[in-house]
Amino acid sequence: MKAIKIAMVGAALVWSASAYAAGDPVKGEQVFKQCKICHQVGPTAKPGVGPVQNNVVGSKAGSRPGFNYSDAMKNSGLTWDEATLDKYLENPKAVVPGTKMVFVGLKNPQDRADVIAFLATQHGQ
């Protein structure tokens, strides 16, 4: 029984890791268009309604300069890795209750994987 549980956990980890690896940054750029209402990326990106998303993968939540984050985000203790971004993009208010983000989330797991893959390519200021 214990071996079955370990195998199931291992399979889940492999599956979730492969879901992130399967993200397509080109498709993610298309999905990200709905995020551009509030967020910018690229060398000339500036904070607006939401913070700049350059270099977001691997960064500490609520720490980007030039944006007034909610106390909930600043105190969340999160680091934006693929797993955390996936959960947050699915349902922001469930992951960080009190976040200022009004977006209800991306329900499609492939869309989330694609956006995360796109964000991983966004470097700059």
UniProtKB/Swiss-Prot annotation:
Entry's Gene Ontology molecular function annotations: electron transfer activity; heme binding; metal ion binding
Superkingdom of source: Bacteria
One example of a Gene Ontology biological process annotation: photosynthesis
Keyword list, A-Z: Electron transport, Heme, Iron, Metal-binding, Photosynthesis, Signal, Transport
PROSITE patterns: CYTC (PS51007)
Residues the record lists as binding heme c: C35, C38, H39, M101
Segments forming domain Cytochrome c: 23-123
Signal peptide: 1-21
Pfam family, one: Cytochrom_C
Family designation: Belongs to the cytochrome c family.
Protein name: Cytochrome c2
Organism: Rhodomicrobium vannielii (strain ATCC 17100 / DSM 162 / LMG 4299 / NCIMB 10020 / ATH 3.1.1)
Lineage: Bacteria, Pseudomonadati, Pseudomonadota, Alphaproteobacteria, Hyphomicrobiales
